[in-house]
Amino acid sequence: MADLDYIKNRIREMSLTSMLSAANSVQNRSNVSTVHALFDIAKCGIKYSAGYTDYLNNAFETKTPDERRETITRGVNNAYVRKLNSPDLDSCFNDKRQLYALYRDFISRDIMDIEKASADNLKAFVGDNVKIVVRKPDAKGNDGTFVLNLFGVNDFENLRERLLNMGLSLAERLVTQHREMERLCGESVAVIRVVTVNNVAVFACLNSVYGKLKLTAPINEKTGVITSSALDQQNGMFHRHPLTDRRFYGFKIPLWHDVISLAERASLVLSSVKYCGFYIAVLPDKPELIDATSFPRHDYYRVCDNSVLRRKIEQRISNEIN
């Protein structure tokens, strides 16, 4: 049974319009009525701590009560975070400047704090590069992060002022991906997301952004091989990458053992944060940490066998306690 605080918060946050939209989606893909779906979504929110997005992502209308109980829902994921991570360290992950300092041993790309730099410093940082990455210090994932094309830019005083006015106070070198990653994803942004529990990798996926599409494909964390086709934000399936036409299934991520090693070594940095998500790029000769979070997003778990992952996570928690 979900705890009362969670239920009260979810009821407060619930949007009837969104719930009706979710119920209509369930009706369109199954034989149940919209009214039945709406009541079932509400029931699952209370009984399994599942939001309507959980319901849609995990096709709850097709699951038995036992299967629903075994699914990692929003409430279950929140419980993992509360159990394994100290909230006192949230600020380390919410401010990229603190984050980069904390994980500096896993970051090799040049990074500049534009607030502390002059226009001449910014010009020197850009150098001959046509593109750089700019971020808000509190950026979450790809939100608040942009690739900036500087072709023809000569007024760096104006550029600096405009960036700061938009809150984009961090500048970074654009990383060069491994050739094999480019063969799969082309020039689209691609990162490996690795989740660790008690310093051991339990989940991995590829995330490739192409235009408005955000494609996610599961990776076997032991072998580095993609185990199925990719899903987009609406759970549409992509057997091939739309930019390169290469198959997702069966693709082996290069330098895989180095990727997992980086994530597991990085998970040791903060002993009181035991449930971590690491976002890693694969460069030509090594992996590079791009971002980290103390609140791994559970919606990525929809691409794998969710119940198997839940047992794996809870076994890691149990092993540590015992």
Where are these regions (language model features)?
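Short, solvent-exposed loop/turn segments at secondary-structure junctions
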Residues: 138-140, 176-177, 208-210, 281-282, ...
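Phosphate-binding site of ATP-dependent enzymes
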Residues: 151-233
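Conserved catalytic alpha/beta cores of large enzymes that bind or transform nucleotide phosphates
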Residues: 228-251, 258
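Glycine-rich phosphate-binding loop of ATP-grasp-fold ATP-dependent ligases
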Residues: 132-159
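C-terminal active-site "lid" helix and adjoining low-complexity regulatory extension at the edge
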Residues: 4, 9, 245-261, 268-275, ...
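Protein kinase-like catalytic core scaffold
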Residues: 132, 202, 288-291
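Acidic/histidine-enriched active-site and ligand-binding environments that engage anionic O-linkages
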Residues: 123-133
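Conserved N-proximal alpha/beta basic substrate-recognition cap immediately N-terminal to
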Residues: 10-125, 140
